[in-house]
Amino acid sequence: MAGRLVILVLRAYQRFVSPLFPPSCRFTPSCSQYAVEAVERYGPLKGGAMAAWRVLRCHPFSRGGVDPVR
């Protein structure tokens, strides 16, 4: 149940907020898509922690690249 709510919030962000800003994520998939996939696969606690760690690694000095949910 909590996982569905988290995914709903992430999808709302992807649909309504993200298009207002230029693309800036250095990773593929984007950080918000990574968060959706992590929560779907591991649940809101572990998936949320994985997503938070990913966002912390997404900064101008990061090399970025392909980083799928594993």
From Swiss-Prot:
NCBIfam families, alphabetized: membrane protein insertion efficiency factor YidD (TIGR00278)
Keywords, sorted A to Z: Cell membrane, Membrane
Organism placement in taxonomy: Bacteria, Bacillati, Actinomycetota, Rubrobacteria, Rubrobacterales
Membrane protein topology class: Peripheral membrane protein
Places the protein is found: Cell membrane
HAMAP family the record matches: UPF0161_YidD
Species this chain originates from: Rubrobacter xylanophilus (strain DSM 9941 / JCM 11954 / NBRC 16129 / PRD-1)
Function according to Swiss-Prot or TrEMBL: Could be involved in insertion of integral membrane proteins into the membrane.
Homology family: Belongs to the UPF0161 family.
Name the UniProt record assigns to this protein: Putative membrane protein insertion efficiency factor
GO CC entries: plasma membrane
Matching InterPro entries: Membr_insert_effic_factor_YidD (IPR002696)
Coiled-coil residue spans: none
